[in-house]
Design a protein with these regions (language model features):
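CBM-like carbohydrate-recognition segments
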Residues: 1, 7, 11, 15-18, ...
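Long, well-ordered core segments of solenoidal/helical folds
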Residues: 2-18, 53-79, 126-144, 188-205, ...
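Active-site lining segments of carbohydrate-active enzymes
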Residues: 27, 41-53, 61, 65-69, ...
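Boundary/entry segment of secreted carbohydrate-active catalytic domains
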Residues: 247-303, 308
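Solvent-exposed loop and edge beta-strand segments that line ligand/cofactor-binding
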Residues: 1, 22-36, 87-106, 117, ...
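Aromatic-lined substrate-binding rim segments of carbohydrate-active enzymes
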Residues: 2-6, 294-339
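Structural helix-adjacent loops and short alpha-helical linkers that scaffold large soluble proteins
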Residues: 1-6, 46-60, 112-131, 137, ...
Length: 339
């Protein structure tokens, strides 16, 4: 694999970007947007591992060339390939495939995780990532999903979970990495994650995954594919990272920070995976713990969850749904934990 990569880097193609099925010469460049997930992270990782700029330079040259060819600067979305230039959906909008753009955005998240902060080339990918995330967030449907066609969901009303999974993954990564504003993007992430968990049936199968293709198509509840599951797991990893402090065995979830600024006692919720002592709570100076605070079990999820609360009474038998004193916080908890 490395030998082949070396050959590609040392013999860059000057071929066309016009993908033609059956003509392997047109696969020498990144001529379809899916390739922006497949190839760039490999070269970014090789650069990181070897510190050899030739991998970075090759990736950067090819990525920018693909961007100039496939990116629509009016819609801030990527065409799947040149065959869709000029095509329209039933509503007259341009054809932008949900999973195609999800491949691109997830690929950008992968690239950014390999490029060191302060690297001159990184700024280009950060700017594109933020630009695309902002556009994608605005295209989420009320049900929390993105659909097969980004600009004509009415023609493809079924959920589509492979695109939704990769979008949630990228958006959650962006918040975790400090690239995206938490207040703006957390509602989108929570809604998307809740939608994904709703798409898992009683047997554990993820449904609503569009089969292998190149453009928007109809999707049914029974359709599944390994890349859809991969997108779901990638999203779950970032959601977990968002919730878990790796230096302590507890989960932090907090509501809108503007609310916290007005009343710091209304904001912090801490879950522990066991019925811990007061010393556990007191060692975190950002959590106010009154002497008469209570610790109550609120869930029988995989991790045994407890909450330390001092601003309300809480009936543990009612679970999260019985907590009526902070509606916004309840929604945040539900979005993070519900299946």
């Amino acid at each position: 694999t490395l030998a082949r990569t070396e050959w590609i880097v040392n013999h860059p193609s000057n071929g066309t970007f016009k993908l033609e099925y059956g003509d392997n010469k047109t696969l020498e460049r990144w001529t379809w947007c899916d390739a922006l997930f497949m190839a760039p992270p490999v070269y970014a990782k090789l650069y990181r591992e070897t510190n050899n700029r030739k991998y970075l330079q090759f990736m950067d040259n090819e990525y920018r060339a693909t961007y100039e060819y496939l990116f629509d600067k009016e819609e801030n979305l990527f065409y799947r390939d040149w065959h869709y230039f000029g095509k329209k959906e039933a509503n007259g909008k341009k054809v932008f495939w949900g999973r195609g753009n999800a491949w691109v955005l997830a690929g950008l998240a992968e690239v950014l995780q390999e490029l060191p902060k302060g690297l001159m080339e990184r700024a280009y990918y950060e700017e594109l990532f933020i630009r695309l995330c902002t556009r994608i967030a605005g295209l989420q449907n009320e049900d929390g999903y993105w659909h097969a066609s980004l600009l004509d969901p009415a023609s493809y009303p079924s959920p589509e979970t492979s695109s939704t999974g990769f979008f949630v993954y990228a958006l959650a990564y962006g918040v975790n990495a400090g690239l995206l504003n938490e207040d703006d993007f957390m509602p989108v992430i929570i809604k998307g994650w809740k939608a994904l968990t709703d798409a898992v049936d009683a047997s554990g199968k993820l449904g609503w995954v569009q089969p292998i293709g190149a453009d928007p198509r109809k999707v049914t509840r029974d359709m599944t594919e390994v890349y859809g599951v991969g997108a779901f797991l990638a999203a779950g990893c970032q959601i977990y990272k968002m919730a878990v402090d790796t230096e302590a065995d507890y989960i932090k979830i907090w509501p809108d920070r503007k609310t916290m600024q007005g009343n710091p006692l209304s904001g912090w919720v801490v879950y522990a995976n066991e019925n811990v002592s007061d010393d556990f709570w007191k060692k975190y100076d950002h959590i106010y713990v009154p002497e008469k605070g209570t610790t109550v079990k609120i869930s029988d999820y995989a991790r045994t969850l407890y909450i330390r609360t001092h601003w309300s009474t809480f009936n543990p038998a009612e679970g999260v749904y019985g907590w009526d004193t902070n509606e916004k916080l309840k929604k945040v908890i539900q979005g993070a934990l519900d299946r």
